[in-house]
């Protein structure tokens, strides 16, 4: 059991018999009336998000979540295959458990997978990854001064927008949560 004072992003709660992960929360102390906590909860099974308001100090049942470091091995077309870094056991994860950032994963990338009662709930990908640009249109003289962007295909097959000065073969850092270009990596 936990109280609303223990809320933090990523905490998994049991709400109405379902496992809900806190995505966002905010403690509110109005001038009149009691304090309360606004939360945005994500159902770990279906992925749907809901908004829920709690009175401050309310006790809430938390779920026991076991986090394990795993290595992404490959995608067999229907699921992602990962290996536990301690036991070397392999598991298959459905694409919805990996999230949208999975398109930026290279083989042998470390991923943290959360389990509840032996069942995988979701995977936490690295915040950023470094990937090589497989194809993009060549930059033209003078492109460095303008702030435009162009599409680029990365080595994983994912497509992102990159600055005009980047060329095929450059290595870039990409945010796996948003799919945005962060910076160029010096080789």
Swiss-Prot record:
Sorted alphabetically, the Gene Ontology cellular component annotations on this record are: cytoplasm
List the GO biological process terms.
Answer: peptide biosynthetic process
- PROSITE patterns linked: EFP (PS01275)
Report the principal subcellular site: cytoplasm
Q: Is the keyword Cytoplasm assigned to this protein?
A: yes
Keywords noted in UniProt: Cytoplasm, Elongation factor, Protein biosynthesis
Question: Where does this protein reside within or beyond the cell?
Answer: Cytoplasm
The superkingdom listed in its UniProt entry is: Bacteria
Q: In which pathway does it act?
A: Protein biosynthesis; polypeptide chain elongation
Q: Does the keyword Protein biosynthesis apply?
A: yes
Family, per entry: Belongs to the elongation factor P family.
Q: What protein does this entry describe?
A: Elongation factor P
């Amino acid at each position: 059991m936990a109280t609303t004072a223990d809320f933090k992003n990523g905490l998994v709660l049991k709400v109405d018999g379902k496992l809900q992960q806190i995505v966002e929360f905010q403690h509110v102390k109005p001038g009149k009336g009691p304090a309360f906590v606004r939360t945005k909860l994500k159902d770990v099974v279906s992925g749907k998000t809901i908004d829920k308001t709690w009175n401050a100090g309310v006790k809430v049942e938390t779920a026991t979540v076991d986090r394990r470091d795993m290595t992404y091995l490959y995608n067999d077309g229907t699921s992602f295959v990962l290996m536990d870094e301690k036991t070397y056991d392999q598991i298959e994860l459905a694409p919805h458990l990996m999230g949208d950032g999975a398109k930026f994963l290279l083989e042998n990338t470390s991923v943290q997978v959360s389990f509840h009662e032996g069942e995988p709930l979701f995977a936490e990908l690295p915040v950023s990854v470094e990937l090589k640009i497989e194809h993009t249109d060549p930059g033209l003289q003078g492109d460095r001064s303008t702030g435009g962007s162009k599409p680029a295909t990365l080595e994983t097959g994912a497509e992102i927008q990159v600055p005009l000065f980047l060329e095929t073969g450059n290595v870039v850092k990409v945010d796996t949560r948003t799919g945005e270009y962060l910076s160029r990596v010096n080789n």
